[in-house]
Amino acid sequence: MADYWKSQPKKFCDYCKCWIADNRPSVEFHERGKNHKENVAKRISEIKQKSLDKAKEEEKASKEFAAMEAAALKAYQEDLKRLGLESEILEPSITPVTSTIPPTSTSNQQKEKKEKKKRKKDPSKGRWVEGITSEGYHYYYDLISGASQWEKPEGFQGDLKKTAVKTVWVEGLSEDGFTYYYNTETGESRWEKPDDFIPHTSDLPSSKVNENSLGTLDESKSSDSHSDSDGEQEAEEGGVSTETEKPKIKFKEKNKNSDGGSDPETQKEKSIQKQNSLGSNEEKSKTLKKSNPYGEWQEIKQEVESHEEVDLELPSTENEYVSTSEADGGGEPKVVFKEKTVTSLGVMADGVAPVFKKRRTENGKSRNLRQRGDDQ
């Protein structure tokens, strides 16, 4: 059987971050050491400091939440005061509770029972609040449960002042310049002025201007029909001046009685008067017309283009360029190469042939040949 070595078990110390032998004498010797005891005390102090910091943070957060709740409750009570309602939620008050005073708890319970009975008797008093959506619909909100509904709750009594001043009908202006009336509760719209319509003080000047413009439009429409009588014209002209005092909407009405047997002279005078009134009414309607954010319609007039030749005073370019045929006619110039002969290779005596010197070799040996060494 083969022999083998077995290593001793080791143990890791978390405080000192080192390995020691996993036996009783080694562990006891390490724990009795000064370094190990200092590390243990240091770890305990760190844990204590962390727990204190965590407790401080929790206390700070609880104080912040309490301040937020108090501010929210204060704002809620201010809203209730602004709406003219009584707050049913009491402010939170911190009072020390002791076991030596048992009758106070019973008295508080009796008061709470009485309040609950009162609330059951008058469930809608001071509980429901009426609101209006952005589209003009009315809804009712429960302050206690937070529920909302469209139907009016039983026993609900809103502010009498608000309901008296509240206007159901709203005056508007159509795209054609006619005024109409819109009911915010039922969604109904009509051209005739309702009986219970209450105009706003800020809307009076605009309504007068709209009525003046409507009166001028009605006059222009009535002038197109030749069957209108003189009495109607005077009534319409007088209506333009009196409309500013009393708001009314006039629509086009046809006269049943036709003046077929009138004289031609009176008809001419009537036509002249109608043309004059039309011109003045058109000018008034232009000035009193409601401004359109996209601009007004304009008639496009086509301009006749004249094809007359216009002298642009450009520089003349008659002799500036040469035609391509003239440029190609000359052709490319021919290149002539000259020949040169060498008469002599340099300064030398007459009658002596040129001598070419050979390259000297080192000790009579050629460099290109591989020479055998001296050892061989």
From Swiss-Prot:
UniProt-recorded Gene Ontology molecular function terms: proline-rich region binding; RNA binding; zinc ion binding
Entry keywords, A to Z: Disease variant, Intellectual disability, Metal-binding, mRNA processing, mRNA splicing, Nucleus, Phosphoprotein, Repeat, Spliceosome, Zinc, Zinc-finger
The keyword NAD is assigned to this record: no
SUPFAM superfamilies recorded: beta-beta-alpha zinc fingers, WW domain
Biased composition (Low complexity): 94-107
Zn finger residue spans: Matrin-type: 11-42
Region named Interaction with SNRNP200: 357-375
Modified positions (Phosphoserine) in chain numbering: S220, S227, S229, S262
Biased composition regions of type Basic and acidic residues, renumbered to the chain: 189-198, 218-229, 243-257, 298-309, 361-376
A biological-process GO annotation: mRNA cis splicing, via spliceosome
Localization per record: Nucleus; Nucleus speckle
UniProt keyword Nucleus, yes or no: yes
Biased amino acid composition, Polar residues: 203-215, 316-326
Main location: nucleus
Domain called WW: residue spans: 122-155, 163-196
GO CC, alphabetical: nuclear speck; nucleoplasm; nucleus; precatalytic spliceosome; U2-type precatalytic spliceosome
UniProt feature coiled coil, ranges: none
Comment field on protein domains: The WW domain recognizes the proline, glycine and methionine-rich (PGM) motif present in the splicing factors, as well as the Arg/Gly-rich-flanked Pro-rich domains found in several WW domain-binding proteins.
Function as written in the Swiss-Prot or TrEMBL entry: Involved in pre-mRNA splicing as a component of the spliceosome. May play a role in cross-intron bridging of U1 and U2 snRNPs in the mammalian A complex.
Protein name in the entry: WW domain-binding protein 4
Organism encoding this protein: Homo sapiens
